[in-house]
UniProtKB/Swiss-Prot annotation:
Record domain ATP-grasp: where: 109-300
Catalysis: reaction(s): N(1)-(5-phospho-beta-D-ribosyl)glycinamide + formate + ATP = N(2)-formyl-N(1)-(5-phospho-beta-D-ribosyl)glycinamide + ADP + phosphate + H(+)
Protein known as: Formate-dependent phosphoribosylglycinamide formyltransferase
The entry's keywords: ATP-binding, Ligase, Magnesium, Metal-binding, Nucleotide-binding, Purine biosynthesis
Lineage, highest ranks first: Bacteria, Pseudomonadati, Myxococcota, Myxococcia, Myxococcales
Source species of the chain: Anaeromyxobacter dehalogenans (strain 2CP-C)
Gene assigned in the entry: purT
Amino acid sequence: MRKKILLLGSGELGKEFTIAAQRLGQEIIAVDAYDGAPAQQVAHAREVVSMLDGAALDALVAKHRPDVIVPEIEAIRTERLQAYEAQGVQVVPSARAAAFTMNRRAIRDLAARELGLATARYAYASTPEAFRAAVHEIGLPCVVKPLMSSSGKGQSVVRAEGDLEAAWAYAMSGTRGDLREVIVEEFIPFDSEITLLTVTQRRGETLFCPPIGHRQERGDYQESWQPHPVPPPLLEEARRMAGAVTRALGGAGIFGVEFFLAKDRIWFSELSPRPHDTGMVTLAGTQPLNEFELHLRAVLGLPIPPITLVRPGASAVILARGTGAPVVRGLESALAEPGADVRIFGKPALRPHRRMGVALVSGAPGDDPRALVERARAVAARVSVDP
């Protein structure tokens, strides 16, 4: 079985998915808005177009005639995906999932209003005046996010009236596509944030990975660890909520479902219909198949063995500190750490805080995952990707 897969978005998550697909003999055409993106470096073919250009997407599909389209980013003209699906092309996990998750309004309203899941209180705004009114409605402190963005771009916490103008400007600078709108969320005093990787199958039950804990900074993940302790009743509720929202979206593939966790409560936060950045910890061998291999198997309809914890692990990001062409230093020191591994993504240009790689540390059964985080952070600190 050899499928031609059109990958829309070619970042580090797409690169690992492409490697997984290559290992099972699949053909990948990697698409991104710039040449030399990480997944393009390991794909059979590459294309450089704006995925918000519907005519350009139509031309790509006509040229390559893919069996499967796998979105890796949100900034896609999703109405075209619905048209391709109607023509018989498999869209992963489904065109409906891509359309609902390309902006936070659709997925939040689905979760909170249609499915009745517990979420933070929220309001929307598309002008500075409406934004000020939304903040007054929700109250301070609150969290502001563009309706369409990725990797934490444009997200901030507003704690005082004097922060409003800067928060609006920052959100507009971080938005993707042509949607100029924000969601204002109640600030929940959570104890931790978790990702529940959820695998849906065309034939077979929905599967769940052991919960992943993570820490955010500037709205973007900095470290993740697996497993994260969750009281059994709250884990059962997280699985119920993840199952409900993924069933509503349909299709087959992996979803990264995020939750806020407090002592005795859990809230649905966000969802990505693809491998999740915090799930890169699974590259440390924490489970029998990493998240990219799980995604591929679900996409192709291949058997998936029980997902169990093999060993605890942790990840820590390696960030750029300057601009220009990247030079990698410090690998020898980093890889001298027992149980450590490093993935350099191969992004061709630097900008401050851009994610250029990830440090991975695997432990032995029974090791404290949070102690592994400290080791992963130390490994990441030994690596520099600078001019």
